[in-house]
Amino acid sequence: MDTAGIRLTPKEIVSKLNEYIVGQNDAKRKVAIALRNRYRRSLLDEESKQEISPKNILMIGPTGVGKTEIARRMAKVVGAPFIKVEATKFTEVGYVGRDVESMVRDLVDVSVRLVKAQKKSLVQDEATAKANEKLVKLLVPSMKKKASQTNNPLESLFGGAIPNFGQNNEDEEEPPTEEIKTKRSEIKRQLEEGKLEKEKVRIKVEQDPGALGMLGTNQNQQMQEMMNQLMPKKKVEREVAVETARKILADSYADELIDQESANQEALELAEQMGIIFIDEIDKVATNNHNSGQDVSRQGVQRDILPILEGSVIQTKYGTVNTEHMLFIGAGAFHVSKPSDLIPELQGRFPIRVELDSLAVEDFVRILTEPKLSLIKQYEALLQTEEVTVNFTDEAITRLAEIAYQVNQDTDNIGARRLHTILEKMLEDLSFEAPSMPNAVVDITPQYVDDKLKSISTNKDLSAFIL
């Protein structure tokens, strides 16, 4: 697995995070240090490695300020497997619902996909060449071989040929004739020139097995995986365009070209050494004295999470995985509860605390303009596909930021997510009419913003429903 990302310095990691996330420098610094410590640990001898475990992080801040995005972008920067889970979705062991070990199994699934995607990219050219060869044969097929005439299984008792019931002659073909060879050469040339991309071709693909609906969520998933491994893969015929068929066939050939067992072992190691599990809404399982009935269940979930944070060996369909060196990031608003409401053992497993700042008007302005593909740039690009040019003035952007901030103050504070609703509502009419406005140029001014939003933003009841 490519580990170039893990060698980035904390400054380089923060710089990359700054391309997508505005502010929250303290949080960025702490996650960057946590990542760098992983690289430092990888350089130590085996004995020292076993003694050093990651320092888990607890992010505290309201929704929409960047907690999840910082963790997700960080994982992407270093190429680490990342999974986000919600603490409220888990139940105590013995109850119907997802048990806490499922987060580790989900992380391993992500790790396997990462490793296999990279290994497939290394054999992509060979797999595509095989796919093109198969496409030529599908577009110009040979004659099918005739089925064996030995249909009576008792015939072998009287000296006849022994039938091979396991052999499937359905796809076997006669050697191609000279005429077929000539046609295939022509088709191959046309494929290479891209002239047949929209032509239809029939291919066989593996049928997606149905789900079992008789068990609880977690038991259902494990039973389904076992059944899928035991049962033979069933294939169905589909008619698709050549360009789609090439992707399906190339992916299938790439699977055959890579060593699956080696990839699975590499994925398990990657999950163990580089895995990041983001546990959102951890404040919702914190206990307080207001509702003693629910506190028992919440404490049960916390106590189930604790062994995984301390280091447990979890069984997955790819093999066992140890959670001791995974990085866990807990996150929550902690409006009702406090970090000290978590059970003491769990508090001790999150030694690094970082409080994220609420967003001000200036932050909203920066979010709209600074990131690599900011919201403003996204909407400009979308409307440009309809040949409509949209220009946002600086004053209009400031006005949008002011409205977003005010609506957050007057209703629920959902942070930067408010900008999505504000922009979507403001550009609703333009997005609807854009196909009938080719080559139009639209200037978004403060007046335009107020015309579209002022009546809503000044009415608290309407704001709560619409924005």
From Swiss-Prot:
Biased composition regions of type Basic and acidic residues, renumbered to the chain: 178-192
Keyword Cell inner membrane set for record: no
Task of the protein: ATPase subunit of a proteasome-like degradation complex; this subunit has chaperone activity. The binding of ATP and its subsequent hydrolysis by HslU are essential for unfolding of protein substrates subsequently hydrolyzed by HslV. HslU recognizes the N-terminal part of its protein substrates and unfolds these before they are guided to HslV for hydrolysis.
Cellular compartment(s): Cytoplasm
Underlying gene: hslU
Biological processes annotated in GO: protein unfolding; proteolysis involved in protein catabolic process
A GO cellular-component term linked to this record: HslUV protease complex
Stated name of the protein: ATP-dependent protease ATPase subunit HslU
Keyword field: ATP-binding, Chaperone, Cytoplasm, Nucleotide-binding
Pfam families to which the protein is assigned, alphabetical: AAA, AAA_2, ClpB_D2-small
GO molecular function, one term: ATP hydrolysis activity
Family the UniProt entry places it in: Belongs to the ClpX chaperone family. HslU subfamily.
SUPFAM superfamilies according to UniProt: P-loop containing nucleoside triphosphate hydrolases (SSF52540)
Region (Disordered): 149-192
Subunit relationships: A double ring-shaped homohexamer of HslV is capped on each side by a ring-shaped HslU homohexamer. The assembly of the HslU/HslV complex is dependent on binding of ATP.
Main location: cytoplasm
UniProt xrefs under HAMAP family: HslU
Record bears the keyword ATP-binding: yes
Binding site residues for ATP: V22, G64, V65, G66, K67, T68, E69, D280, E345, R417
